[in-house]
Amino acid sequence: MQELRFVLIVVGALAIAALLFHGLWSSKKEGKAKFGNKPLGKLDVDQGDKDSVEQERSFAPATEDDFEIIRKDRKEPDFGMENTFDSKFEADPLLGGVAEEKHSVKEEAEEIPSFVAMKNDVEDVAIQPSEVEEPMQEVVEEEIMPSAFDAPKQEMEMVEEVAPAVVEQPEEPKPEPEMQVIVLNVHCAGEEPFIGTELFDSMQQNGLIYGEMHIFHRHVDLSGNGKVLFSVANMMHPGTLEHGDPAEFSTKGISFFMTLPCYGEAEQNFNLMLRTAQQIADDMGGNVLDDKRNLMTPDRLAAYRRQIVEFNAANA
């Protein structure tokens, strides 16, 4: 921007100087042509009037008005008629002083262009700012216009940057389903309770392993590794199957339970738990009961399976 402004100022100054030089040259040329067409008789003015004019010029004080007088006399012809003029004054010895005054006036006239040029230069310098300001305004307009056209592009870029942030909204985590528990019981058939030695042996043969919380668990792996599919606790208080000597442990029954959701297929886990409970009941001579300690019926088994299906559908 600064370089362009400097170039425009230099070009404007050169153009103005060229116009001034051409104007001075044209005015000088027109003056010569204008006076050259006049007859010689018109240039012979009254000698007395000429002397009085020249004396007034030689003795007049140098004021600012002299510049006006000099500018008017500057257009007088300075061609071959000056020789005739000078010869007339030089021929008359009485007018020798007047001839000298004539030379002094001519010297002043020759110095006129410098004063005129200086004054014109001052006027030109004063004019330059106003003339140079026009191209500067054009440059500013040229710079503003592209920015106005670029504004929509910038807005579009901002919209494109903001759009992905609006579209990409994090999905809200689904709430965890409410846990449900399915319970089966194996109870002794009479008044005689289960003895720990026989009970624990039957449980171990059906893949149950004593572990955490002092109860038995059925893992995915029969070696006791992996996720727990279901567990077995004491049906009586305090609920644990903790024992020091299995022969001294006894209980009226045990409870099988599994949770929903669970690892793997819930329906398969329920079927495995049901078979294990039935096998232990057969080994111990007991009965399989539901969660309310009623004898298991086909309708109650269907209700258990329906509960599992509805839970899976609600949390699919």
From Swiss-Prot:
Q: From what superkingdom does this record's organism come?
A: Bacteria
**Membrane-spanning intervals of the chain:** 6-26
InterPro entries for the chain: Cell_div_ZipA, ZipA_FtsZ-bd_C, ZipA_FtsZ-bd_C_sf
Ranges in a coiled coil: none
Q: How does it sit in the membrane?
A: Single-pass type I membrane protein
The primary location reported for this protein is membrane
Ranges of the Periplasmic topological domain: 1-5
Q: Could you tell me which residues belong to the region Disordered? A: 36-65
Q: Which SUPFAM superfamilies did the record assign?
A: Cell-division protein ZipA, C-terminal domain
Subcellular location(s): the record lists: Cell inner membrane
| Parts of the chain on the Cytoplasmic side | 27-316
Asked if the record carries the keyword Metal-binding, the reply is no
Q: Name one GO cellular component term.
A: plasma membrane
Basic and acidic residues compositional bias: what residue ranges? 41-57
Q: Which GO terms describe its biological process?
A: division septum assembly; FtsZ-dependent cytokinesis
Keyword Transmembrane in the entry? The reply is yes
* Keywords (A to Z) from UniProt: Cell cycle, Cell division, Cell inner membrane, Cell membrane, Membrane, Transmembrane, Transmembrane helix
Q: Which family does it belong to?
A: Belongs to the ZipA family.
Q: How does it assemble?
A: Interacts with FtsZ via their C-terminal domains.
What does this protein's UniProt record list under function?
Answer: Essential cell division protein that stabilizes the FtsZ protofilaments by cross-linking them and that serves as a cytoplasmic membrane anchor for the Z ring. Also required for the recruitment to the septal ring of downstream cell division proteins.
Protein's UniProt name: Cell division protein ZipA
Record the organism. Answer: Vibrio parahaemolyticus serotype O3:K6 (strain RIMD 2210633)
Please state the gene responsible for encoding this protein.
zipA
